[in-house]
Amino acid sequence: MPNKKAARNAYFFFALDMIPELRRRGLQVSGVREAIPLCSEDWALLSADQKEAYAEKARLLKNDPDSTSTYNDGVFGQRKRNATKSSDFSSVGFFQLNDQRNCVTQRTVPAMNIDISFNKNKAPDQHVCYFINIFSHGDMPSLCEQRYVPCEIACVRYSLREGILGSFHDFIDPGELPRGFRYHCQSGSASTHQIPISGFELANSDYHNMFRKLCSFVCPTPCPVVPVYTKANDIYRVDWCLQWLANKAGMENHFRVQEVETLIIKFYQDKLQEEPSRPTVSRLLDVVQWDYSSNTRCKWHEDNDMWCCALASCKKIAYCISKALASVYGVTLTPAHLPNPERSRNQNSVNPKVVVLDAKRFQRVCSSDPKYSTDKSERSSFEPRGVKPYQGPSGGGRGILRLLETLAASQNSSG
């Protein structure tokens, strides 16, 4: 049997360029063979010109089979050699338009995870971070050429010390919907944010101005890498939509979307030298108590009494962090931290929707607080007026066992 090798066609070179991006998404990819079946959706997003650029690489290799330098150097070696050529469209799976000329160029910043570190000149609670979310008219199936249909974007500036410092919000005009998937978009919208898929008067089609305002809001001074945070489950969608918006705007995308769960763990690490588990942090962010709070949703969603809003999702991340970490860092809660800080301060600390992460400190509080005492005399003062405390049976065990013991005792006494 002949030794079959992967055909070095246009798709082969695209899969080669996609390897770093696939690894960034958490996929275990060791080579092109494993990357090939994972790149079909991203390949469908490329324009005809971009696909032609990869086809040209394949033709060059076919004409000169001994020349293997075009792919052996990997993504970054090829990128360095062709940095000045406008015909090089490799972009680690995504592409961007240059702000000065309307032609596709390579991505200037390779996809990578950024180490979360706080400014040494500032306390961690003074660190300013940005929470972002972008909603779509559903998650398009693999048959669709477009992965998402962006419709709403929001970003919140936040510090633990000061609370929410500002917000950015806009509705995105998705343009022409993918042909044949209008019903899919309609269903996705109706089941979540309910933003109209067409004819929406608030939808903004000035992509350049929208993206420029977002960049000015997050990073007024130029910066090669700008970290923004969202929930781990939303990272791929938000990152894809940012790339799409940057392409429409004709600008470079310097945003790097990071997990807000990692940021929260970093806050605990710096203060307590301990870190909660990731599932615990995920549960911390999974709350519904502020869905209908005032000044949380955008005006359109609030006027229409809808809780699923991109701006609200960003603000609720800030609320969760404020409520969990305020006591750890000794921060006084204000209306910039929570919609109703007085109520949050006075409510019972054992809230089923709030996860207590510092278990040792909570146990110390419980042992010293009479509310959690096992002594009935101490606990009776906390019973509602007019209600007698429940005097349970002295016996232990399951109810069925006590019932059997009672029946056996009654039979013995009657016998």
UniProtKB/Swiss-Prot annotation:
It is found in: Cytoplasm; Nucleus. SUPFAM superfamilies: HMG-box. Residues 4-73 bind DNA. CDD domains: HMG-box_MAEL. Residues 372-386 have a biased composition (Basic and acidic residues). The keyword Nucleus applies. One of its GO terms (cellular component) is nucleus. The keyword Iron does not apply. Keywords: Cytoplasm, Developmental protein, Differentiation, DNA-binding, Meiosis, Nucleus, RNA-mediated gene silencing, Spermatogenesis. One of its GO terms (biological process) is regulation of miRNA-mediated gene silencing. Residues 367-399 are annotated as: Disordered. GO terms for molecular function: DNA binding. Belongs to the maelstrom family. Plays a central role during spermatogenesis by repressing transposable elements and preventing their mobilization, which is essential for the germline integrity. Acts via the piRNA metabolic process, which mediates the repression of transposable elements during meiosis by forming complexes composed of piRNAs and Piwi proteins and governs the methylation and subsequent repression of transposons. Its association with piP-bodies suggests a participation in the secondary piRNAs metabolic process. Required for the localization of germ-cell factors to the meiotic nuage. This is Protein maelstrom homolog. It comes from Xenopus tropicalis (Western clawed frog).
